[in-house]
């Protein structure tokens, strides 16, 4: 094995939001002036936690089947005996022993695209918990295939392009039939990174009715959209899902957040057993550059959509050691260092998440899954110094089997300008979008964090992991952290408040979400709660600040890594498009599955401190807060 020398430096950029009011800006389709928040999917999910599930199963005299998929299927049939559905081909058993099975409701052979059912099966083959957003209203009596009075897919494409002001030329579009019922790919278009697609599906609307729609898929770079266009009125777009998650947010060595925390250090062979082919091979080919099984890193100064022929540093002996100083400018003068840093951070995070259970079967990002389940050919495409934007970053997460795509931008908030690849937090934040989107709802469904509140939690998970990874041995529960301070050139960072366990420093409570209308603001509330959770577990189990966790029977032995593990496991347990209450319950269930509930009261205390206690209730307009603990705590 050749030695790999990585001179690593990291940092983390985001939008400059210094005050709470500034976080109320809407999410806008990049540079096209369309408010995407107005098209978000409604929250429809319900979640039955492990305690309630045990009571329900006992009341039903429900018995397990021969395998976990059959048991899960039996539960769905017993819960919705009159509904039709299909098993999604992405079930797997997590490293915590919980089996995850996902179902999609159908009507007349068409998917009801936002009607999902997830069932979690424990080690003994019994139902552990489940969630669903199945449609309970009246299904149309007649199949739309009988009279075929719906519009053709080309009109739907043109309707989406017009309504969302997309840079796609569709005047000469023609629909070509592809595999799948009423599924098409468009030819004769331009402006999208890949051929647009359309599929006829039903959609649950906000008012509880069912609409027949064309699900139109368009990847235009900054946005990768699923637009639900009414199949009878092509000028009406009901909802939009965006696979791209944007940030407003950095490695030296792993754990250093940005250039203020240390100096570049060289590492030899830094990969772990989570990357059996090393970082420079996919098991078939060896690459003398920043390419391997988990990621491919390159510069992208033009902001274009191609990447295979873009520039990457080359080293036959795998020594990637390049100069960088804070005075170097412009960022292109140190692109070798930047690409190397981005490659290092992405791979290092892949290996850490793999140890927690984000592996092949769970839908991680790898070319070669080595016969371990899931779909391969989907490493992370990570672009350094991407010219398609500034002062931001984003990550696109299509379903398992298609590569994720990260775009890291330069920051004009300082002189000389700063490179987002040098702040580890932004890379971690962005990659975490890939983690949460693959786990929530299953690897085959990347549309399960697209409601406003669930999308906010997607941002919050990114902030939480970025912050947890940068903790230092000297830190205590009184330590505060900002987000994006280096990139934004502002010590306060880009969030409304610092992450802190002090209620005066950070006063966010569950009911604060009532006044927030933007995902990053909502995400700050969620990440604040997870920060409380982490410090509660550190106080209970100690804080080991080694780069990698030490496991005993699958359980991390320190509070910091334990928090990261159960938060991640909770993502796989919760329903598609969850709310705060359901995500909290899923984390409590994750601890129950992992430790038999040893940390139940510690977790409850953390959430209760921030108003998400035992009596908290979700309502999209008026959430009810609670500092109450459950009986026994």
From Swiss-Prot:
EC number in record: 3.4.24.-
Leader sequence segment: 1-18
Matches recorded under InterPro entries: FTP_domain, Fungal_virulence_M36, Peptidase_M36, Peptidase_M4/M1_CTD_sf
Subcellular location: Secreted
Annotated GO biological process: proteolysis
Main location: secreted
Keywords in alphabetical order: Glycoprotein, Hydrolase, Metal-binding, Metalloprotease, Protease, Secreted, Signal, Virulence, Zinc, Zymogen
EC primary class: hydrolase
Classification via SUPFAM superfamilies: Metalloproteases ('zincins'), catalytic domain
Residues listed as glycosylation sites in the UniProt record: 410, 480
One Gene Ontology term, aspect cellular component: extracellular region
Pfam families hit by this protein: FTP, Peptidase_M36
Proregion positions: 19-246
CDD domains: M36 (cd09596)
Cofactor note: Binds 1 zinc ion per subunit.
PANTHER family: EXTRACELLULAR METALLOPROTEINASE MEP
Record protein name field: Extracellular metalloproteinase 3
Taxonomic source organism: Arthroderma otae (strain ATCC MYA-4605 / CBS 113480) (Microsporum canis)
Organismal lineage: Eukaryota, Fungi, Dikarya, Ascomycota, Pezizomycotina
């Amino acid at each position: 094995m050749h030695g790999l020398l990585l001179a690593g430096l990291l940092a983390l950029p985001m939008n400059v939001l210094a005050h709470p009011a500034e976080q109320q800006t809407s999410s806008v389709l990049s540079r096209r002036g369309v408010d995407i928040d107005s098209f978000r999917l409604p929250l429809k999910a319900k979640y039955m936690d492990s305690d309630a599930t045990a009571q329900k199963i006992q009341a039903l005299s429900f018995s397990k089947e021969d395998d976990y998929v059959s048991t899960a299927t039996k539960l769905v049939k017993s819960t919705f005996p009159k509904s039709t559905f299909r098993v999604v081909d992405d079930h797997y058993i997590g490293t915590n022993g919980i089996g995850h099975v996902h179902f999609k409701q159908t009507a007349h052979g068409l998917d009801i695209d936002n009607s999902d059912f997830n069932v979690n099966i424990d080690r003994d083959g019994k139902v552990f918990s489940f969630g669903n957003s199945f449609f309970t209203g009246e299904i149309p009596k007649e199949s739309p295939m009988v009279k075929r009075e719906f519009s053709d897919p080309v009109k739907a494409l043109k309707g989406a392009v017009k309504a969302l002001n997309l840079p796609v030329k569709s005047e000469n579009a023609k629909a070509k039939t592809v595999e799948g019922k009423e599924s098409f790919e468009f030819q004769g278009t331009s402006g999208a990174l890949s051929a647009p697609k359309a599929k006829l599906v039903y959609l649950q609307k906000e008012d509880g009715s069912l609409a027949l729609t064309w699900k139109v898929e368009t990847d235009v770079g900054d946005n990768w959209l699923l637009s639900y266009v009414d199949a009878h009125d092509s000028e009406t777009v009901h909802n939009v899902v965006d696979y791209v998650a944007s940030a407003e947010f950095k490695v030296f060595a792993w754990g250093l957040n940005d250039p203020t925390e240390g100096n570049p250090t060289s590492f030899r062979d830094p990969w772990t057993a989570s990357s059996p082919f090393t970082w420079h091979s996919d098991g078939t080919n060896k690459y003398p550059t920043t390419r391997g099984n988990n990621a491919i890193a390159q510069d992208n100064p033009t902001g274009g959509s191609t990447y295979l022929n873009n520039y990457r540093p080359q080293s036959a002996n795998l020594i990637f050691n390049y100069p960088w100083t804070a005075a170097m400018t412009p960022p292109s003068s140190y692109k070798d260092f930047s690409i190397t840093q981005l490659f290092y951070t992405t791979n290092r995070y892949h290996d850490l998440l793999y140890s927690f259970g984000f592996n092949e079967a769970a839908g991680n990002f790898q070319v070669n899954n080595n016969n371990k389940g899931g779909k391969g050919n989907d490493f992370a495409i990570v672009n350094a110094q991407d010219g398609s934007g500034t002062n931001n970053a984003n990550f696109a997460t299509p379903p398992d089997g298609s590569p994720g795509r990260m775009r890291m931008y330069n920051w004009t908030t300082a002189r000389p300008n700063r490179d987002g690849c040098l702040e580890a937090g932004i890379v971690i934040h962005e990659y975490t979008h890939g983690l949460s989107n693959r786990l929530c709802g299953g690897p085959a469904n990347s549309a399960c964090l697209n409601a406003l509140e669930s999308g906010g939690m997607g941002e919050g998970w990114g902030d939480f992991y970025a912050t947890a990874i940068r903790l230092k041995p000297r830190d205590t529960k009184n330590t505060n952290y900002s987000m994006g301070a280096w990139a934004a050139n502002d010590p306060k960072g880009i969030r409304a408040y610092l992450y802190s366990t002090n209620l005066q420093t950070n006063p966010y409570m569950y009911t604060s979400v009532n006044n927030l209308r933007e995902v990053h603001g909502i995400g700050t509330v969620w990440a604040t709660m997870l920060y409380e959770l982490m410090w509660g577990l550190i106080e209970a189990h100690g804080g080991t600040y080694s780069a990698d966790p030490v496991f005993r029977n699958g359980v991390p032995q320190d509070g910091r890594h334990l928090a990261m593990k159960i938060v991640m496991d909770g993502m796989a347990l919760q329903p598609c498009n969850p709310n705060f209450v359901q995500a909290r319950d899923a984390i409590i269930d994750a601890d129950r599955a992992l430790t038999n509930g040893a940390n139940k009261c510690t977790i409850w205390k953390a959430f209760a401190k921030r108003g998400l206690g035992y009596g908290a209730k979700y309502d999209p307009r008026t959430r009810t807060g609670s500092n109450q603990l459950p009986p026994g705590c």
